[in-house]
């Protein structure tokens, strides 16, 4: 159920239709191509502005950028030009802007920011920890949070809470384990089920050994 924003090889309105009708959240039109520029308004009127995104690069004529809002564009994917797109009332996705962490914090606090896409996020990048850092810096981002703090749970004699782990689709009970406060907080922060082993007297993450992580 991951929502996709899809673009590439758009030459006519029918290509936009194919992307949207196959389930894309938005179709991307490339503003460096005249054929895409010509169909922005018509695509927005036909499929809805919420379905249309455009990609700009630093060579774009920014004197024309305000027209995009009137043409019904709901998202700008700004290739190396995110800061030039701030303040237009259109959501912005920064793309390949070579931001430092401080740049990301500053950009993330701007109005209408949709997100940041960068090559540094590739591989085994720890997104959850990164988002937690952004949250601490005051950037509005979605992180895992618990409706209850650890001290609100009823604990056993060891000061731990028993955890019954179930498959979220079938409700099948997979295992029973225990969490101390550290394991509980790590579970919320990382999104990976983390427990306390009473026999080994240590924290452990389900899946580190077997590869079968629980989320």
Where are these regions (language model features)?
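Glycine-rich beta-alpha junction loops
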Residues: 33, 57-60, 98-100, 120-124
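Short beta->alpha connector loops at strand-helix junctions that form conserved
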Residues: 8, 29-32, 119
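Conserved anion-binding
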Residues: 17-80
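Binding-site signature for planar aromatic cofactors or substrates
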Residues: 135-215
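Alpha-helix-loop-beta-strand connector modules within alpha/beta enzyme cores
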Residues: 1-5, 38-58, 81-102, 137-142
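C-terminal helical cap(s) of enzyme catalytic domains, especially alpha/beta-barrels
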Residues: 37-47, 104-143
């Amino acid at each position: 159920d991951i929502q996709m924003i899809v673009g590439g090889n758009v030459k006519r309105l029918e290509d936009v239709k194919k992307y949207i009708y196959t389930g894309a959240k938005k179709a991307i039109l490339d503003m460096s191509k005249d054929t895409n520029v010509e169909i922005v308004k018509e695509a927005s009127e036909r499929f809805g502005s919420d379905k249309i995104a455009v990609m700009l690069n630093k060579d774009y004529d920014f004197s024309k950028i305000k027209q995009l809002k009137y043409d019904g564009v709901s998202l700008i994917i700004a290739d190396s030009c995110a800061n030039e797109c701030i303040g237009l009332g259109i959501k912005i996705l920064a793309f390949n802007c070579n931001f430092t962490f401080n740049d990301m914090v500053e950009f993330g606090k701007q109005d209408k920011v949709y997100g940041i896409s960068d090559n540094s996020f590739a591989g085994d990048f720890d997104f959850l920890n990164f988002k937690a850092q952004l949250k601490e810096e005051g950037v509005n981002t979605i992180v895992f949070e618990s409706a209850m703090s650890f001290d609100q749970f009823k604990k056993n004699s060891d000061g731990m809470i028993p955890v019954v782990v179930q498959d979220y689709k079938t409700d099948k009970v997979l295992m029973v384990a225990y969490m101390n406060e550290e394991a509980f907080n790590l579970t919320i922060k990382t999104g990976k089920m983390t427990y306390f082993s009473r026999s080994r007297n240590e924290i452990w993450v389900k899946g580190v050994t077997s590869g079968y992580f629980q989320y």
